[in-house]
Amino acid sequence: MKKKKKAIYLLFLMPFVYFATACFVMWLVKTSGIYPSGSDTMYHVYRGDFVYNAIKSGNWYPLYDASWYNGVELLRYWSPLPAYVMAFCQFIAGGSQFGAYLIFIGGVCFLGACVWSFIGRGFNRPYLGAFIGLLWFCMPNNLCAIFIEGNLARSLSMIFLPVFIYAVYKYLDNQKLRYIPLMVFTFLLTALCHLGYAGMVAIAVIIYGIVYIIQKGRKRAVLDVVISMLLGFMLLGIWMVASLKGGITSLDNSENMANFFQNLWTTINPFERLTRGFENFYFGFAALFVIVFGILFGYKKSRTGFVTGLIILLMTTKSAYVVLKHLPGSQYLWMLRFISIALSMILMSFLMWDRLKKPLVLMLCVLLAADTIPSLSLIVGEHNDVSVQERMSARQDSTLISNAQAVTKQRLALMDESILGATGSWLVSDYGNPVDATFGAGREAANTSTNIVNLNKAFAQGDFLYVFDRCLELGDDSVLVKKSLLEQYNNSLDDLEAASNTVGYKRVEQNNDYILYHIDTPDSWGVVSSYRALAIGSGAVTISMQFPAVETADSDNLNDYTYEELSGYKEVFLNGFTYDDKEEAEELVLRLSRAGVKVIIYADSIPQDKRTHSQNFLGVTCSTITFHNGYPDMDTRIGTIYPDMFPQGHTTWNTVYLDGLDTVWGTFYDNGFSLDFYGTVKNDNIIMTGLNLTYFYSLTDDESVGQLLSNMSGISSEELPDRKIVPLKVEYGKNEITITSNNDNVNTTLAYHDIFSSSSNITCRNNLMYVNKGKTVIKMNYPYLWQGALVSAAGVVLMVVWMIVKKKK
């Protein structure tokens, strides 16, 4: 009885201790001289400011933000709860964004600690629970999430994650129904913080469930846990259905996956932080010691969490990546992001281990606390007490962002490959004299994400005419370039200057690190464009980068286009195209060629015939061939070509040559045989080429190959589309945009969204919205409202029915 009273006293005392600790952490961060740190921090601060100002104007759920990415749905693709929490913090801070950040940090520290105190009480281990509460915020991986990654959404979920794991543990232990709503609700809150992270939590819990079944065999209880998570997702349907349409789901995350695996020793080495800083994820040597100790000496009830923690740790290694990358959905297995989930399970199992002697409990607690010490410097920083306003203003000046804001009339493109993290985009659009931007943070939410990727890729390749021309297409009257990128990619400042001048931009400012270009325009404007050629297929953008006068088509499928649409171009390129009906596609090409349109087909990516399983089109068959280190000499109609060697990493070159050309314009010799790779079929307006020359040219800029590619089409790499800047009047209302134009077929330079609807004709090309002459009123409506509401309603009904059935049983 006395022990129970002490536990209750502790339960009421610890929140005061945690509050004092949170206030101390806030003071340390404020005086650190480096806050707000973290690459993505200012993205979350920006979203909070966006919601805060929208609510002040009477809009409680703003659908659209015009400042980033040519217009973006800021609450659609990233979970909304962190934005509203940050907005609430900003309200408490009297409108200060920096104050909001400090309150957010303090809140995560305080609430994250409190939940562990209650969990300790639930396991009848109040003192250990109170200690873990103090420790949780300071766990190295949690500190890195806040102060290095700046992933405030995931940090917010650290409040709900332990409660969810606790509910899972308790339900599997005693199958009491009261833990089911707790599981559903806390999982729902975790998903509202970060949907992707909720998916990772679900995977980790399924791993835990498999281990639990092997140890104890209670399959039905584990199934109940899985159902609870599914219901959590369903209840979120009103937001989640819209979130899963486009945006994040349209991006390929397979390359990102590889970045979330590392060497095992790096993950557990406690001294790595002292020698290399915090560039790597840290699981914790102390946590590993607790795992091993728990597996060897613990009992079944607590051992499951320790085993699961070890499995997750092993799954973070590069060796595991070799296996995991072949699994379905593997692009979302960012295993190093699972560390905090594993730590939560380990600490929960530590709490459950009630038979462990007190001296050993104390030893493990000391070890866990000692392991956090090197990471505490992330909170303390330089402790120089330099004002955050001073630092931000100085950074704005040193990067020429303040100069760019002064001259920009419509939109700014910051070409720095996000070297400043989200801070750069925040400095452009939410600090000083804010202006709209083509770039931003949280690119997964941008409908113009492919445009942005293409700009960065073209800049790296030195295709500067494409860069400046497409910046004009995106409505950027100012372009700010990080100079070090030129050296990084072995590009020339002279070429950059020449390209900017050709498009119409002039250099207006530069310092040692940045150079600012600007073009004179009206205050608000659009673009009327005319392209001489169109490229269709997955490789279309490569052609456009090499020849900026070529427009990139929206669809790769040739059957999606009519003769009337394509006959207005002088040339049509097919590179990586697809079709549904081969005969119809061939007939379209023939009809275009007879009308005088030149059709250039890059044969390497001709679709495979469904019946013959061979690559053939218009009677020409592609035969595979492999070169090593370089091409052989090529005899062409412009003379003999001696291409450069293949670049490093591409020394084995798999490609095709052609059989069935009517007129041969290019051959090479292989093993004594003359093989065709370039010529015409049916008539001189249908040109085919093999050997994957376009890709080779994109890698090497080989002059002779470039001349050959130009000869095929007659287009020069110096040629630009015909563009005319025209004035527009753009007015924003509550979930409404009104555009007034004096011209037809005007690119508004605003990103097109599926939430747009209008009685006037609005169209989408290259992810941008086009309008015609007159006034166009565009309404914005919540996307997929009824579908999402039905999913949420179904979740509520299923949960109620399920609970009733289980209660009766």
Indicate residue ranges for each PLM-predicted region.
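Membrane-embedded transmembrane-helix bundle of lipid-linked glycan/lipid transferases
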Residues: 1-387, 399, 478-481, 492, ...
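A glycine-rich, often tryptophan-bearing local segment used as a flexible ligand/cofactor-contacting loop or short
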Residues: 583-642
